Regions:
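Long, C-terminal-biased catalytic regions of enzyme "large/alpha" subunits
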Residues: 1-463
């Protein structure tokens, strides 16, 4: 592990060490057109694209909303089988293909808009029928308002059970739709790709924060044109595909070192975003000021390289495990407080390894409101640059109530996604405990459905 100011993703570092059979981009998307074999973005070509992405180390999001609903006819005597039927093919591809021929931990996520006629089937399909893909529902406030109560109920249950993620529909500055990636922190055009890396806030002194942001963005922008991703013909070339994704990890470590709570930091960020600095906030104010200086410096670098989007807060578990803070403790993932101060990482690929975050504030001490204020205010700061992708925003299943009001509050917030539902009141961080929000009888029914199926892939942009 290292306490460097910049934490590279495994994909970038592995590509630098050995570019053979892999690419440094973390993610890509493919928008499937409603044709079996006609056109570059046909259904059949999507299979080749997904195969290419997984074999070269990129997680791939497949957007299926343009496909005709199940049972509809095309006027030529052909009847559509619907998006879910093709989802089973992508699941099998992900199960079978080894990323770069080394680790079997690729990621594939299927996306469908909430107003697609087959959305209920998409939400309620049993996990054993789609065991190697995750499912994400794309929506806007207007779409949610037009959604029936029955569909809302099914969607909320899917969120509680961990089977369904949410992503806001987003358009670029020219009004063209861009599409959520595997882990929901990046928005791309079809066949676009994104490089990711992270500022290790835990390795920074306060005055080093701007330098870390500047250096991290400079390295990403320099690497952007040298990846060779467009040479295969599958991905868009860097000359036209203009985005990178600089995120951050180790925030809890940084706050611990300067004895600042999440509540204090959130308040300082809020005041700064309103151009109202509170001089009584001490180190919380200083961290917030340096944080904004870093974001502004990184944004200027991205603009000088003509990037369309440049900030993305990814789920950095794997990357954080390889990074340490100034005092030698493991850097905490992304910007959220960890669930416990120590964690055993149980990975089917890498086995069980223990990690110690030090005496950081943990989620149960921070509280949902204080954490959400920090997350919202950071998103507002990044939004103000005009270069934001998004944030893989986890909810806390044993704290929040998954109901209409929760979704409506999320839609009105600066958050762009609703990712995993995590239990935070225990001491074990385990994203596989997807039934955390269910009652006992529901858990029994749920487990009966999945007990004998293959495990879900770890959908992590760094692994």
């Amino acid at each position: 592990m290292t306490h460097e100011l910049i934490s590279r993703t495994g994909r970038v570092q592995n590509w630098m060490d050995n570019p053979e059979g892999r690419l440094p981009v973390s993610c890509t998307v493919y928008v499937v057109e409603d044709s079996m074999d006609e056109g570059r973005d046909s259904i059949e070509n999507s299979w080749r694209f997904v195969s290419h992405a997984l074999r070269y180390g990129a997680g791939v999001a497949v957007h299926l909303s343009k496909l005709r609903p199940k049972g509809s006819e095309n006027g030529k005597g052909l009847t559509a089988s619907g998006p879910v039927s093709f989802g089973k093919i992508y699941s099998t591809l992900n199960e079978t293909l080894r990323r770069g021929g080394v680790y079997k931990n690729g990621a594939c996520v299927l996306h469908l808009d909430i107003n697609h006629p087959d959305i209920l089937e998409f939400i309620t399909t049993p996990r054993h029928e789609l065991p190697w893909v995750k499912r994400c529902v794309n929506l806007t406030t207007e779409m949610w308002d037009d959604t029936s109560d029955a569909l809302r109920e099914s969607l909320l249950y899917g969120i509680k059970s961990g089977d369904i993620w949410l992503n806001k529909i987003k358009h670029d500055n020219n009004g063209k739709r861009i599409y959520g990636n595997v882990c929901l922190e990046v928005y791309l055009p079809s066949r676009g790709t994104c490089l990711l890396q992270h500022v290790n806030l835990g390795a920074c002194d306060i005055r080093e924060i701007p330098t870390a942001f500047y250096s991290g963005m400079s390295e990403l922008c320099d690497l952007h044109g040298r990846t060779g991703v467009g040479e295969s013909g599958e991905y868009l070339p860097p000359a036209t595909d203009r985005q990178v994704g600089l995120g951050m990890l180790g925030l809890a470590n940084l706050l611990r070192r300067y004895k600042v709570t999440y509540e204090e930091f959130g308040y300082a960020l809020e005041k700064l975003n309103m151009d109202a600095i509170d001089t009584t906030l001490g180190e919380a104010k200083n961290i917030a000021l340096q944080f904004k200086m870093g974001v502004d410096a990184a944004a200027n670098v991205a603009r000088s390289h003509n990037m369309d989007r440049a900030f993305a807060i990814a789920p950095t578990a794997s990357c954080s495990y390889r990074s340490t803070d100034v005092d030698g403790y493991t850097a905490t993932p992304e910007i959220a407080p960890p669930i416990g101060r120590k964690v055993d990482r149980d990975s089917g690929t890498f086995g069980v390894e223990p990690y110690d975050y030090g005496d950081v504030e943990i989620a149960s001490e921070v509280g949902w409101d204080a954490y959400k204020k920090v997350a919202d205010q950071i998103m507002i700061m990044l939004q103000n640059t005009g270069l934001l992708h998004g944030y893989s925003f986890n909810s806390w299943s044993d704290v929040v109530a998954y109901d209409n009001a929760f979704v409506e509050e999320w839609l009105a917030s600066p958050q762009t996604s609703l990712y995993y539902s995590l239990q935070v009141m225990g001491d074990t961080q385990n994203k596989t405990n997807v039934y955390a929000a269910l009652d006992e009888s529901s858990v029994k029914d749920y487990l009966a459905d999945i007990l004998n199926t293959q495990p879900q892939p770890d959908c992590n942009c760094q692994e």
